Amino acid sequence: MFKAIVSADTLGAALDSVSVLVDECKVRLDEEGLTIRAVDPANVGMVDLELSASAFESYETDGGVIGVNLDRLEDIVGMADSGQLVHLDLDEETRKLHISLDGLEYTLALIDPDSIRQEPDLPDLDLSSEIVIEGADIDRAVTAADMVSDHIALGVDPDAEEFYVDAEGDTDDVHLELDREDLIDLTPGEARSLFSLDYLKDMNKAIPKDAEVTMELGEEFPVKMHFDFAEGDGHVTYMLAPRIQSD
Amino acid sequence: MFKAIVSADTLGAALDSVSVLVDECKVRLDEEGLTIRAVDPANVGMVDLELSASAFESYETDGGVIGVNLDRLEDIVGMADSGQLVHLDLDEETRKLHISLDGLEYTLALIDPDSIRQEPDLPDLDLSSEIVIEGADIDRAVTAADMVSDHIALGVDPDAEEFYVDAEGDTDDVHLELDREDLIDLTPGEARSLFSLDYLKDMNKAIPKDAEVTMELGEEFPVKMHFDFAEGDGHVTYMLAPRIQSD
Amino acid sequence: MFKAIVSADTLGAALDSVSVLVDECKVRLDEEGLTIRAVDPANVGMVDLELSASAFESYETDGGVIGVNLDRLEDIVGMADSGQLVHLDLDEETRKLHISLDGLEYTLALIDPDSIRQEPDLPDLDLSSEIVIEGADIDRAVTAADMVSDHIALGVDPDAEEFYVDAEGDTDDVHLELDREDLIDLTPGEARSLFSLDYLKDMNKAIPKDAEVTMELGEEFPVKMHFDFAEGDGHVTYMLAPRIQSD
């Protein structure tokens, strides 16, 4: 059983954060809320989404897992005007999700969860640096790096107490330094890792420009980024595996 | 002889309603105003446009029929700013239409009307149901149906006093019900017909979101939709032939 | 040595006026400011750009010539918000230009100036007519002409004291007449020349709609167009060779 009412904006933001990495996903339902964990086919980028029951206008479930085509569901939710409510009602027998918004009813066929790539474990890493940064600054760094290269180094200089971004192209380079003044917060430690820009660009699409993003970095380790949405009732964690440094 | 001045907005709306179905058309001129009737090459969708002389700032003609390339004429009219006036002046000898707006003169070669597909007769059908609906609701129904299918059923349930829309896809379905409260007016009768979504999407493009659209429906019969524009001085009727129900 | 600070808007406008004609260019630096001269590969359209030192927040150079990839530089400058300042700093040893905006540093590899097409001489022509016209009117003429033809005639009728534009297509024609009332200023003389519309469309892209453009025209002679930007501290001259009249 699953029956819920939620604002289209909240549901849309939740779906967007997952759909930048995968087309289909398992949605876990329990009384606390809904969670989605997914990893891209190459096992490089992972997402962990939590949308707590308090993010919903009403929320009832006795638990379960459903398989969802994200594009379809996003298209339907995208038809709603901002602030409109979306009603979700699971039909367990037919394995269909009834979605209604303002008189419009959409019957979405669910996917067998067993046919969907297994959910990843997000490893509990002990990363040396923690940076709290505005979403807009991540966007700026990613956009600039994309002009010159297809990979990007993220690092922290503990002496200078700076977070930095490096992208080296064949002829041109991009460099961005943000110190304590420019950041929301910084817990410095030796850290530098190289990442595929494609994945970071995808994740960046789902990060609100005004979000406070907490970034955890290490030495040639994955980066973790987390941020809240829906006034704190929604939470996204991205994890991106490093590329091997070529030098 | 044909000499007229009309606002670019009015002329643009008139042309748009026809150009969604055909590229070329005959324009009939008489002292009452201008009329265009056209049917698409597959004989599925028809349009009947009336723009009365009172829609013009000035209007003079002694009658006649001209053949027009709609894309060309729309491009020219599209150059005008909102509220700007377009001057039309027919040169009978050269069979060219002189169009001027704000100092710019465009000479449009007309098409021999005999080379254009014959104008259809819009049959006088006795349809059982009449629905008066906002253009925005048609847009919503068409957009949602388009997510799942390439055809759409429009119907009326006389007992429930509801107008409904059904689209059945391979896996997903869309359903919309609008009762008296949601509609502007309803004269219910048994009615349900299936239509090609492509045609309805084209017609929908030309229906203003804030228009009151009168829709006449029957049992496996064509649908008629009409609406006014230019403050009532312009009137469009669309007629769309049904598809054969597959079940 | 070259070290300067300039608003992104001013630098962007300067680069745009050149990049509509060429991809790479030589930038001449001296204490008066920066100048760029370039001609397109077919030797049909030329540009002469001057951006005086007073257009910059700060400007220091001991002279020199650098070769620049315009697309790259435009992309970087395009990342700035309106009103933001761009810092430019030339590293003579590495032949790289350091560009920084709001903490972001971009290192642009310069091009060997000797590998770039030679700068043209803009001939000092004695043209019979001078028209001062709003950029918006050039845009209107070019857009309308483009509907019917790939070339455009610009002329002056000294008796009627009118500037006119003619474009003749296979079936349709466009004509625009602007008299003293419509123009900012007119010094009439016999003038009519035919031009390639493609070039004029490119130049038109870089002409601000609210610019006062001075156009010099002759009988089957090149047209010169000049306008100021950056509150008079920037100046662009375009010159476009005529096409041979086909009749």
Swiss-Prot record, chains A, B, C:
UniProt cross-references to PANTHER family, sorted A to Z: PROLIFERATING CELL NUCLEAR ANTIGEN
Gene that specifies this protein: pcn
Purpose of the protein: Sliding clamp subunit that acts as a moving platform for DNA processing. Responsible for tethering the catalytic subunit of DNA polymerase and other proteins to DNA during high-speed replication.
InterPro entries: DNA_clamp_sf, Pr_cel_nuc_antig, Pr_cel_nuc_antig_C, Pr_cel_nuc_antig_CS, Pr_cel_nuc_antig_N
GO biological processes: leading strand elongation; regulation of DNA replication
The UniProt record lists the keyword Iron: no
Protein name according to UniProt: DNA polymerase sliding clamp
Quaternary state and interactors: Homotrimer. The subunits circularize to form a toroid; DNA passes through its center. Replication factor C (RFC) is required to load the toroid on the DNA.
Family: Belongs to the PCNA family.
One Gene Ontology MF term: DNA polymerase processivity factor activity
Pfam families, A to Z: PCNA_C, PCNA_N
Database matches in NCBIfam families: PRK01115.1-5
Entry keywords, A to Z: DNA replication, DNA-binding
